Amino acid sequence: AAAADESQVDLYFEAAVAGAIPIIGPLKRSMAGDEIQRIMGIVNGTTNYILSAMDATGADYAETLAEAGRLGYAEADPTADVEGFDAASKAAILSTLAFHSRVTAKDVYREGITKITQQDIRSAHRLNCTIKLLAVCERITSQDGSQSVSARVYPALVPLTHQLATVNGAFNAVFMEAESAGQIMFYGPGAGGTPTASAVLGDLVAASRNVVHGGRAPGDNTYANLPIANFGDVQTRYLVNMYVVDEKGTLSKVTDVFAKNDVSIATVYQDELGESEACLLYTSDA
């Protein structure tokens, strides 16, 4: 972007995030006069296919990844996808455009899906949720009124009543919350030769029109220059799965540890497994 500005040429990259879904253009144009508060996106088709299949079939991660490879949804080396690097790069682009502040992939907190188990998925179901790898880009306002940008990628609990919970397979979606426009969701194929070509062709047409009419595309303005928030300063809810000894007072000891660290427990489930118990704890914001 800096090189393009220096050379006074336009930079087009609609296909860089979510394939055929038009999200870069709306952020640069349609939403330019609004204040975006949050973006939550399913922006990687490989991981969404894997998590959707694990949820639907009950298969474990390794088995589902292998099937994704056979179907062409996963690369021979899927690291960039399953460890969240690809989604983090896209979160950086979305954050930069939405909050008019320079955000790089290194600024994005990142977790992948390789540690997700069927126990995690069952726990999500008990809470009427599903698990999605989300790219979350958020404007954070502190008590003194100062603002910062939080960008993070991690497997998140999505309530089954939320629109993003219905996005399955290799499809992508970007859910946006803005001060004036309210809630908006963009949905469609996030990868594949033809959908991606559609986005690239759209950029070529836009560039050609600007050449013919002597116009310029909207630049990547970072006038707000908001700082990057520390991940530890972001409050959200957590799902904790653990196995504990099945004896009197064990749960009390566990909750005491959370209380000593100022973390309150909203929901607790226990399942007996012989001499041990599976314990599910869902925290309040922490």
Can you name each region flagged by the protein language model?
Residues 12-74, 85-86:
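Rossmann-like NAD(P)H-binding beta-loop-alpha module
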Residues 1, 16-18, 270-273:
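Short, ordered loop/turn segments at secondary-structure junctions
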Residues 64-166, 171-173:
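Substrate-binding/catalytic subdomain of NAD(P)-dependent oxidoreductase enzymes
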